[in-house]
Amino acid sequence: MFEDNEERRWFDFLAKKTGMYAQNGGQFDMSLQVTIPNEWEKIAPVNIGYTAGIETDKIAPGWVERSALMDRITVISEHAKYGFDNTTYEATNQQTGEVIPDFRCTVPVTSVSYPYKHIETQEVSLNLDFDFNFLCVAQWSVRKNLENTVRGFVEEFKNDEVGLVLKTSCRNNSVIDRAMTNNQLENLLKPYPDRKCKVYLLHGDMTEEEMTGLYNHPKIKGLVTAAHGEGFGLPIFEAAYNGLPVIAPDWSGHVDFLYAPKKDKKGNVKNKPHFIKIDYDLAPIQQTAVWDGVLNADSRWCYPKQQSYQSSLRKLYKDSKMYKGIANKLQKHIQTEFAADKMYKKFVEAMGVKVDEDTTEDLVVFD
């Protein structure tokens, strides 16, 4: 999603300014490299790598090697941090021939979430036949597991007047891609000609205001994801801070913001799930998902259990008012604990810069 707004223009200006400075022989005191770890380089006295991390349970060997070029690393979830902190390999020093049995990232890794953003709502006109509809926002890919997401929905609601709005694309938001995506969806639904439930394809560019309108549409009752893994899960985060009930596996990046403190009967406060959990198994990623240097064949991610997924859909359908109440509590928690000023302060401190209360007043916050 690309938008020509103040924040985008500010980033473009800084990128252009930085490029011109480097071309003229300028030297940097510190580099913040926002890219995939394969591209990290030592280009300044202090170098900080910033990445979304990984959707599986371990990072690639090349990432471990490149992490040594950084002084600090910042990621966007505890799941991504776990991958950097706990992945180990057996390696050989190419210069000495020494075998390293515990080759790992030794650089400090900090997790800093995306911030909550207040976005004005723009009404989205959807021609939905039923009052109860689920929403899924994901690119059509192996990792997002859309085939099983759609198939499980249809199997569960083939005799019910329920809808699934699928905001998706295969590669981009072009007209050609829309035809390709529509064709894939039609083929997936062919075995169910007599179903009562309906699946709607929503394709194309949408602004942040329109997406907010989608999350707050009166006929959209919950967001569902059966993805194998997330580095963070931005659409899930957006849905949650808009007060939309969420159905998701209890694994990977999105669990950071789907839990909130809750008092038990004894008055003890514990972090509790504020979403409907899908049971899963951890297993090696599919061969079609292997990405050399990024997603290793021996890495694992979650495989949502289909029956658990379908029963989770049914739970929300049968008791949407209760789950909406839980979602509203999570919304308040996110808006407070993931507020922009808190996240920006945490991000700056992750770079080794101490931020006092007076300094935070000068932070530029893009709403």
Model-found features: residue ranges?
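Aromatic "clamp/platform" in nucleotide-sugar-dependent glycosyltransferases that forms part
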Residues: 228
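Short hydrophobic beta-strand element within catalytic cores of glycosyltransferases
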Residues: 245-248, 258-259, 265-271, 276-277
